[in-house]
């Protein structure tokens, strides 16, 4: 689920980069939330209570999550207006490390030592790829947008984990969509550009893809800890390079390729180490039982 969600977010960001050349961030994000809300309410009109209840015992967390989602989408839309897709994602790849820190600080989750080590290795891969880009004159404004968007994204993922005890997924779409629609409406109105047929299709697709990707990531982080899943978010690096080349014709430099290899290695080794750590206590318990 995590891998599919990340792939869909890559497609979403590629589509957003195309849209950013013609439409304001406010208009694109507004229509994204309109689409999400319309799909959810339409589904619930056909199947009552589809996705579970909209009520929650944690209104503050849902409100904070909605704000984090809104600013994450808005900031990344602005970032990709100034940056190549792969470069924006290089900044995004600090999210797994931030997620581990937030899970440890706010959720009091025990993070295995192996997860810290291999996420650190993955973060090092990001640095390898990013430093030459900064020295090459990359937009600092775009990088700033991407960094702030990454912090918002990590906050969203951490809150998803904190809300894992709540059954149903409808509220995960409803409240952020409602807030986004209300918050962006006046800004979208002031900067409205009438879309053509292709524009409507792309703007609507943004909402559909965003909703599907959000649900997949929420499900993934409800069924596994950030410590285990966070390193696998780094797989978005090679995926963004592929999209950047296929859609925009941008060829990655040697530093990006090298950094990407380090990141993928960190993903694989982290999973191997976490599985080994999870099995070790059970083996010790079995040995003690036999004794």
Task: Give residue spans per PLM region.
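Helix-helix packing/entry segments at the starts of transmembrane helices
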Residues: 89-94, 163-179, 214-245
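Loop-to-transmembrane-helix transition segments
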Residues: 1-4, 50-75, 141-149, 194-212, ...
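C-terminal-most transmembrane helix of multi-pass membrane proteins
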Residues: 131, 238-291
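Loop-to-transmembrane alpha-helix entry segments
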Residues: 89-92, 108-128, 139-142, 196-197, ...
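Transmembrane alpha-helices of multi-pass small-molecule transport proteins
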Residues: 22-71, 152-156, 175-190, 265
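Transmembrane alpha-helical segments that form core, pore/gating elements
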Residues: 17, 25-26, 40, 135-195, ...
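Membrane-interface helix-cap regions at the ends of transmembrane helices
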Residues: 37-57, 124-136, 179-201, 205, ...
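Alpha-helical transmembrane segments of compact multi-pass small-molecule transporters, enriched
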Residues: 35-39, 91-105, 120, 178-183, ...
């Amino acid at each position: 689920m995590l891998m599919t969600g990340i792939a869909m977010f890559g497609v979403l960001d590629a589509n957003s980069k195309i849209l950013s050349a013609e439409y304001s961030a406010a208009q694109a994000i507004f229509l994204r939330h309109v689409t999400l809300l319309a799909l959810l309410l339409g589904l619930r009109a056909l199947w009552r209570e589809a996705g579970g209840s909209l009520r929650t015992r944690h209104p503050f967390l849902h409100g904070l999550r909605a704000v984090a989602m809104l600013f994450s989408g808005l900031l990344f839309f602005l970032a990709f207006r100034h940056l190549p897709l792969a470069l924006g994602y290089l900044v995004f790849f600090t999210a797994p490390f931030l997620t581990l820190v937030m899970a440890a600080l706010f959720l009091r989750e025990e993070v295995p030592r192996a997860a810290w080590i291999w996420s650190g290795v993955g973060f090092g891969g990001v640095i390898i790829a990013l430093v030459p880009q900064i020295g090459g004159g990359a937009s600092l404004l775009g990088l700033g947008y991407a960094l702030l968007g990454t912090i918002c994204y990590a906050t969203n993922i951490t809150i998803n984990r904190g809300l894992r005890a709540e059954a149903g997924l409808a509220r995960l779409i409803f409240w952020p969509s409602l807030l986004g629609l209300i918050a962006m409406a006046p800004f979208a109105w002031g900067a409205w550009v009438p879309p053509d047929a292709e524009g409507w299709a792309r703007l609507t697709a943004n909402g559909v893809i965003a909703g599907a990707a959000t649900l997949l990531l929420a499900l993934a982080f409800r069924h596994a800890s950030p410590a285990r899943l966070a390193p696998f978010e780094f797989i978005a690096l090679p995926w963004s390079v592929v999209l950047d080349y296929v859609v925009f014709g941008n060829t990655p430099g040697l530093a990006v390729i090298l950094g990407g290899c380090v990141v993928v290695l960190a993903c694989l080794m982290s999973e191997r180490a976490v599985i080994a750590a999870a099995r070790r206590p059970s083996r010790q318990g079995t040995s003690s039982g036999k004794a």
